[in-house]
């Protein structure tokens, strides 16, 4: 943007910007007001009346302000002289801002708006929600069109969109026009590249449509994961810079109009703001992934940015302490790759950080109401909201990015739901908002229907799909990628030690809300009695429980019925909440035979990845969420020890595969988990619509060891 020549205009622009900023202190936020919801439309109309018209009071105020401008003119001129050396920076900034000229919304620029997805989707008069009440939008969503297609970089997807909304993914060249050319050039030339990488280009084609995206098949730590992060970071920064550019242009327009109303013959819509400043919310599970995201974000700051305030502090606080070594990385060959990639570096899960972006600087650790981007963990954000009783800073989020949602499933999913429920709510306070410049759809409470949500995970789950359905209502449409089972759809049975007998028992789950009770009933009345009747499975049995709530229920049941289960029955239990001494005692007692059964949660395996020895029978209360955990657990007797008690030998002696067995409980509602383990074809047969009642599927060893996973037989006996 070119600097305003008249110093009075310069000061007026500054004053206009200041008036649009929240005026709250940087201290503790006030408690949430329980007063009736304000009529924001009435407030906005009143503010607009003050702007329009040339009343005598307004004229006197303008003259008084002009006197103050004259007094400050000399000071401003001195400051402008000191900025002579910044001519090159100013020129770059002008070029950077001019690249966003399509953002301007005037009656004569409708064709430009149509070409710019940002203006068409987030503009003040967007046709996506104009003229429709919230109830109508919600009712229409139930009737959205649905279909399947194949997208570059995403593979097969399910798309959902309102009738009449065109959300087709455009070609690369056309899609990149939606982004600032300076950012595209950075993407093209960073790391010595000469063109936009294919993965980033494919993702930008999708993101530029402003649709919601659920992508449940990105492998943590992979090159693809990093490329997706880079594309999303550029997309988010482009949104922040376009928003800022429009506001600055309108500030200049209003400043000129205030001094000389006749200078603006062309009408201009200056409704460019929202209730609060933050526009991008980025949720990650640990500080290590937050650090990676911020490194991508700052790489796409404007070329005029000469300072990133508190960035060294951010890097220090989100990395390991100085001088500390990462023992997990040093012993990477002892752990699966996904475990190392997830837990290397700083894995604190309670953090939040505001990032403010201005023309010449960026600031880390900005107060939320002054930030453009909020980076946080679900737990960290929830802690802040509950402490201050304030979530208004989430009222104007326009881009939501949630990374590693599979990890959040292993933390506390309720924290994610807590944050999602508070997005785009009508604020309790005005926070210094200039209502004359607030976009109408904010005042109408329709922001949730325009927010773009980008959800990334390494696997699919009912929880993710439910969140995508209930919390994402983007009127530009929604895309959900369809993941394939591992090994090209064949699952992971080929990784299980050969000769190990596997029994998959399907129970009738009833309705969704009945499934937990049905599973518990099936286990306690059929599975457990069968185990106790056998001389083999009545001891050295490991029970793997994916859900912590099911784990607690089983543990209480076994404790309560200890005497009824047999005089020699005993068990130990370890979960993600067990401390190291408790874990060591339980592992030692189970291995030495002092405890017949060992209960373990999937979260314990996720966080610790210990190899538990002594088991000959493996019972899965439900299929594990992570498919690789199935062959990992069944390989415990054959793998080298890790973090073992000092008394334990290096392996289970004289292990014969024929002595081992696995029992898996599942229902039709476990189809996503079953598919990842046994493969798509067998999962459809085991969990399909015609798979009703109780059935048992037994995997029997094949004679030819060279046969591949797709040839593994699952024979059915109807129960």
Model-derived features with residue positions:
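Acidic, serine/threonine-rich intrinsically disordered low-complexity regions
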Residues: 1-22, 28-161
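Conserved Walker A/P-loop ATP-binding site and its immediately adjacent core
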Residues: 225-233, 253-263, 269, 273-340, ...
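Conserved interdomain hinge at the start of the Helicase C-terminal
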Residues: 231, 235-244, 248, 265-272, ...
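Conserved two-lobed SF2 helicase motor
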Residues: 353-357, 368-385, 590-607
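Conserved helicase ATPase core of P-loop NTP-dependent helicases/translocases
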Residues: 364-366, 542, 552-559, 565-607
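SF2 helicase catalytic motif II
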Residues: 371-383, 388-434, 616-625
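A short beta-strand element within the Helicase C-terminal
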Residues: 398, 599, 610-622, 661-663
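A conserved SF2-helicase RecA2
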Residues: 460-477, 613, 625-719
